[in-house]
Amino acid sequence: MLPTTVESLFAVAKEPLELPEKELLTLLWDQVERDINSAGFSISKPHSISVNDQAQHLLRFLEELPSHALPGLLYRIDVSESALFSSMEGFQPLVWSILQREAIKVTLRLRFS
């Protein structure tokens, strides 16, 4: 099942993160941008910071990305092998896998920085 809420994306945090949802979502998108930029691409900000808008914006970005560039981007984001296999089902599961991975990075940064 694909995550559709902030809570499901940040479920890796055993204890709730002490930040408002809007701030968590801003940190999540900042991490997405950081990884995409470090892979040599750029992505604009979504119209709103909601989880679904971020997912739709990332989906459009991936659909427009040249196919030869996708493996390098996924390597940079550090998407799991199982998520790569799910990408064969389409970009939608891959988008959520990317957002979940980025949420893990945000959680680790908040906990250990």
Feature map (PLM): residue ranges:
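Residue-level signal for alpha-helical context at structural boundaries
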Residues: 46, 50, 73-76, 88, ...
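N-terminal leader/targeting peptides and immediately adjacent processing regions
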Residues: 1-31
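Conserved phosphate/pyrophosphate-binding and hydrolysis machinery centered on Walker-type P-loop NTPases
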Residues: 18, 22, 48, 88, ...
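Amphipathic alpha-helical binding modules
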Residues: 84-113
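Amphipathic alpha-helical interaction modules
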Residues: 27, 31-72
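Amphipathic protein-protein interaction modules
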Residues: 56-95
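Intrinsically disordered, low-complexity regions
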Residues: 3-7, 40, 46, 76
